[in-house]
Amino acid sequence: MVVYNLNRGIGWASSGVEYAQAYRSEVFRKLGVEAKFIFTDMFQNENIEHLTRNIGFEDNEIIWLYTFFTDLTIAATSYSLQQLKESFSLPIDRTEKNGKIISFFFKGSSIVVTVMLNDESSNIVQRVEYLMGGKLVRKDYYSYTKMFSEYYAPEDIGPCLYQRTFYNEDGSVAYEENVDGENSIFKFKETILYSKEELVGYMLEKLQLTNSDLILLDRSTGIGQAVLRNKGNAKVAVVVHAEHYNVSATDETTILWNNYYDYQFSNADSIDAFITSTETQTKTLIDQFKKYLNIEPVVYTIPVGSLSKLQRKEWHERKAFSLLTCSRLASEKHIDWLINAVVEANKVIPELTFDIYGEGGERQKLQEIIAKNKANNYIRLMGHKNLSSVYKDYQVYLSGSTSEGFGLTLMEAIGSGLPIIGLDVPYGNQTFIENNLNGYLIPRETPDNPQQISTAFAQYIVALFNSKDICKKHEYSYRIASRFLNDKIIENWSFFLRRLLNDYTI
């Protein structure tokens, strides 16, 4: 039995989906269940191994679509600059170094080889670009050996990618991809595939799936049809990570599904089970399937994360009046609302501090808001860090998100005993915040009024720190968190796998 977890991408600032998969990988290891995590995006700027290892996966758990058809294994980049130099056929005339970029110039040739190292102090090669007459013609990508090459044709608007060649360990060609804008044709010795979707289907065919295997769809945009067509005898389950429908566009007769789940829901008769993270979402989904589609699919509730232990630290040992939030710095997380709230609350409690963990596209905007309010001395952007032992140094957690399918950081926050202030929205906040017991759920009125919301957050921040029972709220967070300890989630997954696969040895 193998559980194949299907996703698209992963990055340094990963989303909750990737963190949910990382938690799941730990559970499957403890259950002794073989699990593979398949990523189907193209990775050019970073070796996928660095990204998956960073979040907690083991190398032998990872399948990358593009190296699946080669004999390469997932491994950290180790190809050295010396190895590359030994491969040059022309004598080096001179070199130029700028940070982690080294350029080689050759005697009597217009060829320039530009090398991107892992970092400035490293001699490990990540990518090599070949320029001829100042025009880009090829890029090579490395891990412990050359993984693939890209070939470019010069055009007026810049270099145009037209081909990728993927290699085996001995340097032989495994297959080629002909690229025409967004379209690709994949050429193998034995077959030709006319789309990426067909490539995914071919991978599943090669896996020779049996009725003891399971495919868990975490993300399936653009590949859902290929999965259902090529699943063989394997079971298929869909993991719902977010709000699954558009509330404002749904009425008594029509529902608008979240486009990430529309294909799966529309083909629910081909899905063996759905998984949500909360009982509330499970009930909502079951009711909606019955009402709008007149079907009764199997829906399980399994939290996407779990806690290995409660991170204990007494309230008075934490930094006084300290707040934090942790998320991607994205517009839907509404960190700007929280910054403005803390600025307002700071006028009442000047000792307040607010640390914001995470990275993302909103970083510059948020930094400007902090600077505009002259709040640099008490509001900080902390970047992306491992927070497992950080939460317990703080006293209160803030959540500005208007929708969380589960909210892993919320779970981690209460696991460290933090009261939480957040909006009264499904599903994470309503799962981890019990109003007045371990924090506050702020009523949300639509459309959102950012100023009113920030003011409400400020008022609740002040109220919480002035509360005489704040230590009780701190302890109540631990009480809620105990429901999400590893043993409980392991039992949930064990029950699910036994039932779905009819395998009671798990």
Swiss-Prot record:
Lineage, top ranks: Bacteria, Bacillati, Bacillota, Bacilli, Lactobacillales
Subunit structure: Interacts with stabilizing protein GtfB (Gtf2), probably as a heterotetramer with 2 subunits each of GtfA and GtfB, part of the accessory SecA2/SecY2 protein translocation apparatus.
Species this chain originates from: Streptococcus agalactiae
Keyword Cell membrane: yes
Entry-linked InterPro entries: Glyco_trans_1 (IPR001296), GtfA (IPR014267), GtfA_EBD (IPR054396)
CDD domains in alphabetical order: GT4_GtfA-like (cd04949)
Domain of life: Bacteria
GO molecular function: glycosyltransferase activity; nucleotide binding
Pathway, per record: Protein modification; protein glycosylation
Gene that this polypeptide is encoded by: gtfA
Listed name of the protein: UDP-N-acetylglucosamine--peptide N-acetylglucosaminyltransferase GtfA subunit
Positions that bind N-acetyl-D-glucosamine: 241, 404-407
